Amino acid sequence: MGTKGKVIKCKAAIAWEAGKPLCIEEVEVAPPKAHEVRIQIIATSLCHTDATVIDSKFEGLAFPVIVGHEAAGIVESIGPGVTNVKPGDKVIPLYAPLCRKCKFCLSPLTNLCGKISNLKSPASDQQLMEDKTSRFTCKGKPVYHFFGTSTFSQYTVVSDINLAKIDDDANLERVCLLGCGFSTGYGAAINNAKVTPGSTCAVFGLGGVGLSAVMGCKAAGASRIIGIDINSEKFVKAKALGATDCLNPRDLHKPIQEVIIELTKGGVDFALDCAGGSETMKAALDCTTAGWGSCTFIGVAAGSKGLTIFPEELIIGRTINGTFFGGWKSVDSIPKLVTDYKNKKFNLDALVTHTLPFDKISEAFDLMNQGKSVRTILIF
């Protein structure tokens, strides 16, 4: 392409300060350096994490910043040493790297990478490239990256270990969802919770991640899937995707965990918390059965005070586990998930409620914050 080796000017949505609305600006995107790839983003989606970051509810984030981490695009150019992609390839940028060298990447027990193994402040990870500089500038000032992806920019630069090459015929307006929400929820049920055929499950939170977890539970063969959300308007879609029961805690006269225990005659086999608040986490654990109940934490809620538990809650046989990116070995697994989508093994289309031009990103955030959307796709 004629832009190879040159600075590209394009539009991006910048968060100049914490708690302030995004501003669409013209930014300069520098050429990729060694082991870096510059991508033209075709489609990007909104995730609640992006909104949480913009609202300054994550500690350690540096501003100004270009957020966004759920997208798909086309390789524009590559830096020296890049061998896994070439210009023109369709790709999905990934906040979960795979270096293939560290003890985490070499272990079958985890999908973490040493690059981000310290997740005390996840939003502050990968805000600069390997040489500790940014590839973005605006109005003469450097602009920070986000999660190593920064997909709210028409062009972005990522490390070659944060990138999955996908099939040439992939629909980028759908497979962009594999960059975070779907992969996280679906994988949590299959890879982390390891939901079993005939089991009973409870999924707390029916946003994009929660609905994906419902699909994962169904794919794993669960016989009963209880969806829980404070927005009853989400129940129709949840049932269409596999939920057998739906409960709104605000409509109940006793705690949700007590209701679930009564419904299931003792508690569910698997609970998946896709909301992340302290009360929801506790309810998810409490609604699991004694003996073998499993609770998987997926969501990270801003301002959560954590979870207080007592030993006797676990010594009766319950287990707690967490998930990062649904347990997928990112760069290796995403191409396979793209193929599975093409083969209709799961339904990404059902998660897409709106498609808007990128310039209407503020409208997309309003839809999400008002609970009127599941996933909105923004097109450049």
Curated annotation (Swiss-Prot):
Coarse class of the protein's main subcellular location: cytoplasm
Binding residue positions for Zn(2+) 1: 47, 69, 180
InterPro entries with a match to the protein in the record: ADH-like_C (IPR013149), ADH-like_N (IPR013154), ADH_Zn_CS (IPR002328), GroES-like_sf (IPR011032), NAD(P)-bd_dom_sf (IPR036291), PKS_ER (IPR020843)
The organism of origin for this protein: Homo sapiens
Key words, A-Z: Cytoplasm, Lipid metabolism, Metal-binding, NAD, Oxidoreductase, Phosphoprotein, Zinc
Family: Belongs to the zinc-containing alcohol dehydrogenase family. Class-II subfamily.
Regulation affecting activity: Oxydation of 20-HETE is inhibited by low concentrations of N-heptylformamide. Oxydation of 20-HETE is a decreased by 55-65% by either all-trans-retinol or all-trans-retinoic acid. Strongly inhibited by omega-hydroxy fatty acids.
Any Gene Ontology biological process: quinone metabolic process
Protein name: All-trans-retinol dehydrogenase [NAD(+)] ADH4
Principal EC category: oxidoreductase
Top-rank taxon: Eukaryota
Modified residues (Phosphoserine): 121, 278
Catalytic activity: all-trans-retinol + NAD(+) = all-trans-retinal + NADH + H(+); 9-cis-retinol + NAD(+) = 9-cis-retinal + NADH + H(+); 20-oxo-(5Z,8Z,11Z,14Z)-eicosatetraenoate + NAD(+) + H2O = (5Z,8Z,11Z,14Z)-eicosatetraenedioate + NADH + 2 H(+); 20-hydroxy-(5Z,8Z,11Z,14Z)-eicosatetraenoate + NAD(+) = 20-oxo-(5Z,8Z,11Z,14Z)-eicosatetraenoate + NADH + H(+)
Entry cofactors: Zn(2+)
Subunit structure: Homodimer.
Chain positions recorded as NAD(+) binding sites: 48-49, 205-210, 229, 234, 298-300, 323-325, 375
Compartments reported by the entry: Cytoplasm
PANTHER family assigned: ALCOHOL DEHYDROGENASE (PTHR43880), ALL-TRANS-RETINOL DEHYDROGENASE [NAD(+)] ADH4 (PTHR43880:SF14)
Organism lineage: Eukaryota, Metazoa, Chordata, Craniata, Vertebrata
A Pfam family recorded for this sequence: ADH_N
